[in-house]
């Protein structure tokens, strides 16, 4: 469990470095058992949003957690402007603050200098899986999987690509977004304590729970 902060009514934030530190400690603990590990995987709460600097590797704002409702007025305005059906048709999602798109936009619009840095190509976005992959591969790989991408409200579930029209609607540079791989893709190698363990599975927590029900003894993931 991680400590959440509630700076204002309806706001929910998380220090993503706490997550990274816990994951590193967990990996070190597992490695201390001298197990023969062929590969590892990552599962996560899907919509929680992190924006960080490519040049420093540090988050420019605390992670905005999936429960956060700070963008509800903006979402309501988009509904009044008639964008809800387009978003639903492209993403399969309702227009709601729950998802990542409006969280990213809020950070770009409210963190000093963020939009300029994004336009310059210095800012990266990811859900928790993407941030962990980036940090645990030594800032090498900026990837996510389809289950996490599908919860951003920016991913077209028919083309399986980031949607240009939605990126324009939310005013988010495509350069911020990770490359989308299948859940069993090659996400790079885990670099902790001089190990080189392949990361060969990334999936959202709710999707993983379905697999876990059918094969409960076979799964061990970073969560």
Predicted regions and their residues:
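Active-site nucleophile and cofactor-binding loops and adjacent substrate-binding regions
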Residues: 14, 39-45, 64-67, 92-99, ...
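Serine residues within intrinsically disordered or low-complexity segments
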Residues: 220-223
